[in-house]
């Protein structure tokens, strides 16, 4: 989820890469929970059965064979814990990947035949996995470099002209000082920008022009930046561009537009999660208060409460959008569940009591309807 943007977030906030990873833990789990519930409900609605595939190696068998590939990923975090910069951490992780590739003949980046003198040095080097890896990495970095360079120009113009502050003033004026409206306007801006540019560029641009509006309303800086980054990521699955669903359709051979619509159906509950970050005074608990240092003094009770409310809100929205709880839900029950999901996001006591009451009513209607159907 984070990708290269994690390093940029760390640079903006002047925090460590590990703090960025920490902030992403609960939001990522909530997003996966959304997808799991959506798919599980589809399975129950349409009566899907298990599919038996051909004989393939189990995940455990493959892990036992190729466990060493995980070392390069783990080593990035290990080197950063030792105080290395992100650049050096990635460099030494690459060295670890090269070294561990020699543990098996079929994964080595430099063919054994070269060392055994059974292959010409030059030809063997040209056909080696190392050269192909370097070639692929060099090609892939061009896209990131060009994106960051282009975004850097935009950020420079916005900063030097004061457009960022002016833009924030415009947003605050239109929102009338309302945090809810400011968050909605900011989400729309990030979403629109994200339709045209990649995630990293979208985050960089909006962190300069949109984040100050949220910060001006006393939203913690790290929460404002994660709000923007979250919507920059979600723009990847949003029509009309929807780059990720189009890529998935190309891999599976499915229809791009049908894949996009299905993906769009799965994501609405996830769009509500970032609003917990900025609307609720305890919402930063979903980001584990933004750093390991702050987490050490955190109120775990408030973190547990806000996480529980977020989970219930997601479950209400998922069941409402899918139209299924214990059985097929009618329009009235679906409306109650969706309304409950939205009400739970708003941090007022009355709204959350109302949200839980609507969920209780919906559950009662579903249970009674199921009993009548079985009678």
State the predicted function of each range.
Residues 177-210, 228-243:
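Hydrophobic alpha-helical transmembrane segments of multi-pass integral membrane proteins
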Residues 120-165, 179, 183-192, 196, ...:
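Core transmembrane alpha-helical segments of multi-pass membrane transporters/permeases
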Residues 1-13, 25, 200-213, 228-229, ...:
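Re-entrant/interfacial helical elements at transmembrane boundaries that shape
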Residues 93-101, 189, 207-210, 247-252, ...:
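Hydrophobic transmembrane alpha-helices of multi-pass, membrane-embedded glycosylation machinery
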Residues 3, 7-18, 157-166, 196, ...:
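Transmembrane helix-loop junctions in multi-pass membrane proteins
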Residues 22-140, 243-342, 370, 374:
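Long, contiguous bundles of hydrophobic transmembrane helices that form the permeation core
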Residues 64-70, 138-144, 170-187, 215-223, ...:
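Membrane-interfacial loop-to-helix junctions in multi-pass transporters
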Residues 15-17, 81-88, 197, 218-219, ...:
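Transmembrane helix interruption/hinge and helix-loop junction motifs
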């Amino acid at each position: 989820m984070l990708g290269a943007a994690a390093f940029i977030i760390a640079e903006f906030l002047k925090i460590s890469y590990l703090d960025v990873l920490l902030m992403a833990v609960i939001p990522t789990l909530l997003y996966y929970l959304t997808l799991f519930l959506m798919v599980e409900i589809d399975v129950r609605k349409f009566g899907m059965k298990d599919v038996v595939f051909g004989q393939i190696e189990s995940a455990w068998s493959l892990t036992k064979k190729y466990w060493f590939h995980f070392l390069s990923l783990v080593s990035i975090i290990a080197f950063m814990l030792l105080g290395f910069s992100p650049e050096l951490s990635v460099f030494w992780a690459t060295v670890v990947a090269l070294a561990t590739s020699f543990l098996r003949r079929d994964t080595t980046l430099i063919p054994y035949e070269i060392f055994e003198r059974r292959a010409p040095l030059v030809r063997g080097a040209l056909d080696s996995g190392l050269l192909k890896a370097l070639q692929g990495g060099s090609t892939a970095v061009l896209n990131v470099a060009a994106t960051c360079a282009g975004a850097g120009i935009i950020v420079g113009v916005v900063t030097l002209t004061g457009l960022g502050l002016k833009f924030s003033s415009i947003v605050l004026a239109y929102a009338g000082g309302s945090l809810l409206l400011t968050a909605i306007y900011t989400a729309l801006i990030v979403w629109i920008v994200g339709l045209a540019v990649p995630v990293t560029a979208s985050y960089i641009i909006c962190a300069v022009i949109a984040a100050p509006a949220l910060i001006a309303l006393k939203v913690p800086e790290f929460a404002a930046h994660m709000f923007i980054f979250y919507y920059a990521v979600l723009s990847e699955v949003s029509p009309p561009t929807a780059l990720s669903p189009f890529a998935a359709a190309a891999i599976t051979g499915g229809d791009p537009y049908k894949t996009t619509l299905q993906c769009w159906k799965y994501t609405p509950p996830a769009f509500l999660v970032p609003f917990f970050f900025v609307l609720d005074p305890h919402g930063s608990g979903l980001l584990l208060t933004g750093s390991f240092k702050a987490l050490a003094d955190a109120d775990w009770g408030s973190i547990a409460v806000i996480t529980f409310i977020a989970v219930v809100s997601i479950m209400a929205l998922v069941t409402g959008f899918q139209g299924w709880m214990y059985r097929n839900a009618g329009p009235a029950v679906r409306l109650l569940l969706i309304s409950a999901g939205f009400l739970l996001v708003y941090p007022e006591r009355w709204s959350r009591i109302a949200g839980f009451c609507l969920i209780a009513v919906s559950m009662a209607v579903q249970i009674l309807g199921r009993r009548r159907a079985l009678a």
